[in-house]
Amino acid sequence: MGKKRKPSPERSSDEDEVSTPSPKDRTARPTAAARRENVALSQAVALSLEDASNFCSLAFSLERIKREPVDTDYDDPNQPGPSSVPVSARTDHVLPIRFKIKAEPQEYDSDEYGKDHGAVQIANKEVPAISPIEEVSQKRRGRPRKTDAAQHLFFPHVSIKQEPDDGFINFHESRCVGIAQDPEMQHLHDVNESHSSEIAIFRETKKITERKKKKTEAEKLWDNMSLTEKEVFQSHTRRRRTTRLPIIQNFEETEEGCIVEVPIPLIDLDNDAVESVTGPQHENVTVSENVLSTESTDQEVTETKRLHDSSRDFNPPRIQDTPSTVIRPEGDQKDPMSSTSSKRRNTNNSRCASLLSNPHSTPVTRLMRGILDSENSDNDEMLSNDQSEIAKRPRTPRPRYSPEAQRRTNSRLSALTIDTNRSNDLNVDGSAPSSSSAASCGLSTPDPDRTSQQRRKGNQSAARSRKIKTPSPPLSQEDEPMELDSDDDPVNELDNLPIVIDDPSYVLTKEHKEIFEQVKKSVSDRNEFSPAQISEIYRSSKGEQARLPERIHFGAFIMKTWYGSPFPAEFINVKKLFICEFCFFYARSDEIMQNHAKKCMLRAPPGLEIYRKGDISVFEVDGRLQKEYCQTLCLVSRMFLESKTVFYDTEPFFFYIVTINDDIGCHFAGYFSKEKYEPDVNNLSCIMTLPCYQEMGLGRFLIDISYALSRKEKWFGGPEQPLSELGRKAYGGYWRTTIASCLGRLKDELEFGSGISIKMIADDTGVNCHDILEVVCSLGWAKPVDPDEKNHYKLEWDVDWDMVSIILRESEASKETKVQYDPECLDWVPRKMRPSMDGYHELSKEEIEQDEQRRKSIQKTPVHVSMEKATPTSTTSLPVGSVKKELRSRGHNRSVGRNLKHEVNRKVKVPEWAAARDLTDEEITVEENKKQQKQNRKIFTRCADSVLDKSNIREETPEDDEPGPSTKPSGKRQRGNKCNNTESEPNPSGRKTSATSSGRGKYRNRRTDGTEEEEEDDDPTDSEPLTTDDEKPFETSVNKEKNEKSRRGKKVSKKRRSVAGKKFPPNFGVRDRDEPKKAENSEDGEGLESKPGPSTEMILVEKVEEEEAKVTVSDINMQASESKIEGIEQTSEVDIPKSDEDHQSTEAYDRVEDEVPITDYNIPTPDSYHSSPPHSPTPSPQPQLMQAQQNIYQDNDCHFAENDSKPPHLVSEVDDPAAPQPTVTLQSGPSDAPPLSHNSVDGYSTGDDDAPPNLSPQIGKSENNEEEMPLIAPIVQHNGITHHEESTAQHYHDSMNAGPSTSSHVTPQMSMINTTPQQPPFSHPNSQQQATPGSGGVPSCGPAYTHHTPEQQSQQFMSPPMAGMPASVASNHSIHNSNSIEMVGGPASLQHTPQQYEMGHSMAQMSQESAIGGINTVPSIEQQNQLMLQHHQFSSPPAAPPPSQQQQVVQPPIPPAPTTANGRRRSESAATQRTKARQQHQHQQQQPQQPQQRIAAPGVPQGVHPQMQFPMNAMNMMPAYPPFYPYTNYPNIWQPPYQNYPYNQVDYQQPWLYNNGHIPHQTNGTATNQFHPGHMGYFPNNNGR
């Protein structure tokens, strides 16, 4: 128990008498009229206190309110004045606060502050100004408190000016304006949020009312309230605290100054928080019983400052050396407030300010304060529908989400939430600390579940880790004992913090909880997705960003999103996200957004307005200064931009925001971002226009702004590359219009002057030179010609002025409806931004030089040095990389850190890094013999590498999957095996020839100096002139085979190179496996990279029987050297088991391949039919075509190390740079991206730059391009002659024949062949099927289809399932033969060979009898050639029809190709037998081939007659689309002629009437129109439109 303090001798009783109003003074208080006149003074008291050193401090004391109902008159002298509650206070349930204002004019400098600060003129009455000497303290039950300290309160300063008309004061300041208009109103205009958040000590009226009820009628209230009423009460009591200015309730003048009573809400004041506002100007505290004040003395400044620095806590220690100076007069020792103070439950103002409780009952005064304060305050705000001025008062809240700070976990903090660690009261930018910054403070409402010790420790440590406690001052014996403060007693902790759970009568029953859960679930189902729905949305997104949120409410628009955006998790699961269009505050419910709209003070983007014309404005926002705004802007833009990746790193960007202005504000419509620190790289990084504003031309307007800024910066800007589809559409339209306008101005200079350059156009438009060149070349207005020595080109202009005039007319017409840029309205000055301006470190020149030196020092070893070290020194050694590769191929997966030398012992030798040397023939022979003997004892296989290599090759150059001989130019020799020399045959050159031929594959590219030179063979037989098959007629004779044997291993072409002086043992090349890639690379320059491999290891295909393995290669070679018989006879004499078919010699296989008559498999290379002229129809041997085929076998032996090789080059390159890249097929669903419109010939949009109105997926299909029409289902009569089957009635479907009866796409080079009456390349219906690159090994033509991927199976052309696909799919595919399967995403320029076209034409011809009604429905070749080059405006990859839609066609017999076993060719004997059978079959087929074709199409000249799967039938029926169809780029589809077209009625009446208007299946859906490579279009299957 403590004692009372001694009265301080420093203060006299006279001062106390002056400061204590007597009953007489209270009776002389002004009336209501007088108070009305002095309202402004009370506002001055509250608003004129910003700096204590310059102005004044406000002293107040919180007076007690009697718990008993106040029914006496306020002016009754019998009632204690300060404790009496005025009538207005009782009515509004507010607490009157008394201020003592003491005048000390000498404290002010009259010259500095002038008359306005020296005195205040109010109602013709001069009142002295407020002096900065007042002190605030609170009575503590008539005794000192443990932690008595000054409660200082300061407000932003507002200059006071008198309004002579109404007598009120208008407060002016740069950031705060408030006018008191009504003296009776309970609230005033709010002070700016940035100045008042840290002093938000006032609450809203309803909350004040509830707190008053809670204080005065706690027991009665909670005993009589039902649960529903308590919940309503709870919702009111937890509303957010807002700032209000106090109003005057009473006013009186004294000798020393003015005493005013201001009703103030019941607040939680914090001592340390007030001290933090006070700062160093901490004043000495003196305790008074009635009205307390402070005096600032020079003697006490040092001690006071020390105490201030050491007691920055929410409960600072009381000042021990400042005893009370107030001495009561004798006879008046009793405190007038003693009766009230004795009933006070909690004297800690930082916990609960002036709370009353009944001593005979459990305190329930806080009413769920601890529970409710931890809930989200934003949800509370929506519970009020109050339309009062308090609710309408604008206020800028802190955004809900801030990526740079943690989310508030306990937002219901005290009203006065000030960060005590700050030395000043405002932030650097003038804003106040937010409520989240006080989360670290101990001012939050304690959790009732926590223990008393934890609660007390948490509050102490939150503000200050170490708390200095000073002993209490000595008390005199006269002082009666006093109790310790309630905060010191842990037992009384709950009494100090009364909450509703302390009330035993407050019980939540199970029924109440069930009702609450039902209501909560109902609201959740209405506004949020369930977990199951969220899971389904993420599952349907297939690994991509789920389209969440699905809808947004942005201003006056509700829009469906196009893509998902990474909003915080709690905002993702809502069905509709609400976003403020001014500040981008986002909320989960409409109630929260409505409440935010009442408080949001932003009506324009927080940046600098650089452009305004009419109702259009552009603002420049710095991503660093307005980080939260820009981050939310990026999150919003991600919902409409698929390629948006930057969300939170907004510091290095400027955001230029376009708004549409009205009376409400500047509404956000779109924006573009630009790099801040490197403005000369890209003038635009990201651009977005909201879908609701996409019809106004704002996209082009923003592009105009970006180029205007670049022109002011005096450099040629451009967008960041690569452009997206929408970006290319917008920029394409802008570039075309801008360049056309510039050319119109420069027409005279171009036509009649010296000409123009790209630089001139760039200077005029600001567009980058590369973009200008791309546009003018794509439009055909210019082309580069005449390159000079430096490869510089000149431009040859050929401007289509008609097109230019059309573009300019369209541009002029759009100015009436589209937003146009006006250069006169731009107010912007370029400035150079550096990272150092934003606080980032900027590298100096020295640091840049050091970084460059460090980068130069870190370089790779030169190639020739590394290759020299990696080269083995002998034939038995290999590079380490090869050792690792072989180990992996045999199932090993060993780490790099292991010692490979020990792990591969007895198999390979790890090379010793020494200089390479040449090996002699004897050394090579000895090593080879040893290797062969080892392999006879132990056989092992190595297939992993071959499988891997084949899979890699298949990705780039697909191979044959169907049986038949390979007709592709093989670039590699087939891999050998253990028994690959089981056949004895004459070899005049002996072992040296074999060794020379085989040795080239491995050592031809390797020398110590890294160079290459041609090989010099010492064999006299090799000096003979070599002859190739190109110089010989096509025949299969013994002499040819013998010559092939004699030329084995010789230098065939000049491209063969080897290291001079190297000699290799016989048959050394048989064991060559991996190195042939190096030979291919050196030969044509386009081969694969050379990879080191185990060349000396006998790599076998499969394990054979032990007795079969004993037949070694050396024994067979000895037999071959002794044998003198012919090659074919020798082949028949050698008996090889069938089990060893796959182990035949490479030489034998080569002979068999050479014997194959290539004449019937002449798939030409591009040179064969691009450069050579077409030929006559007479079939004859063609050495020109054969030359390309013979090159396959005349090259060096290393070409056959792999099973298969890349196919011949097709019509054009695989990666056609001129072909626009296709768009990925879009899935219909919630996450669909906006379907793109089609590009024109030049690759750019022909319409406006803005996105079309149907960009958003939710709009659905349009009537023009995506309407699904019922298909006509005629009974199709199949041609039995063509299909070799009976004609059967089938349901109509739009697929083509699977066999070669349907033709393929034709290239322009092939069109030239058609127009020339010369002989086409010789072809046979049994031509080998050729797989196109990227098809995964699937042949481009032929009856067999292998769908390797779901994409290929799903892309069914001219089939009913494709008709139902969206336009985004239908517009991104090209017309293609149903037999052609090209990879999705590849160029559409992969064509087929003329032989396939002729084959398809010949098989598709119909006789007169098989035609419709005896009429030949196949048009003449002249008619087809006229339609060749029509409709060439689409470019997309085709796909293959499904197997279910293929017509079964009996394919003509195809000679079977050597089947593969484990990736190897079969035996020579089997190949020889197949060769003989194939020769006989080909001779039988060659004779009737041409007459049969002539009979099939009499009157049509023999030539390439391709029939394409184009939507116009062979009878030249009218297009399926009417004239002026908006999407004219779609190819025309077969449809009956319209009756309003007379020429169709006259010309095609008979074919249409036949068979009820149905045409045969063979001709349905075919046409002869031709496209440019890479510009084939796909059309939807909407026949019958």
From Swiss-Prot:
* SUPFAM superfamilies the UniProt entry points to: Acyl-CoA N-acyltransferases (Nat)
Q: Which PROSITE patterns match?
A: MYST_HAT
- Low complexity composition bias: residue spans: 431-440, 1164-1173, 1482-1493
Q: Name one Pfam family in it.
A: MOZ_SAS
Cite the record's Polar residues compositional bias ranges.
279-296, 355-364, 411-426, 977-999, 1185-1194, 1298-1317, 1324-1333
List its EC numbers. 2.3.1.48
**Reactions this protein catalyses:** L-lysyl-[protein] + acetyl-CoA = N(6)-acetyl-L-lysyl-[protein] + CoA + H(+)
Instruction: Give the superkingdom in one word.
Output: Eukaryota
User: Which residues does the entry assign to the active site, renumbered to this chain?
Assistant: 720 (proton donor/acceptor)
Q: Which residues bind acetyl-CoA?
A: 685-689, 724, 815
Enzyme class at the top of the EC tree: transferase
The record's Gene Ontology cellular component field reads: chromatin; MOZ/MORF histone acetyltransferase complex; nucleus
Q: Which UniProt keywords apply?
A: Acetylation, Metal-binding, Transferase, Zinc, Zinc-finger
- Function, as annotated: Probable histone acetyltransferase. Required to initiate and then maintain lateralized gene expression in the ASE sensory neurons. Involved in determining cell fate in the ASE neurons.
Protein family membership: Belongs to the MYST (SAS/MOZ) family.
Q: What is this protein called?
A: Histone acetyltransferase lsy-12
**Origin species:** Caenorhabditis elegans
> Which lineage do the record's taxonomy fields give for this organism?
Eukaryota, Metazoa, Ecdysozoa, Nematoda, Chromadorea
Gene that this sequence comes from: lsy-12
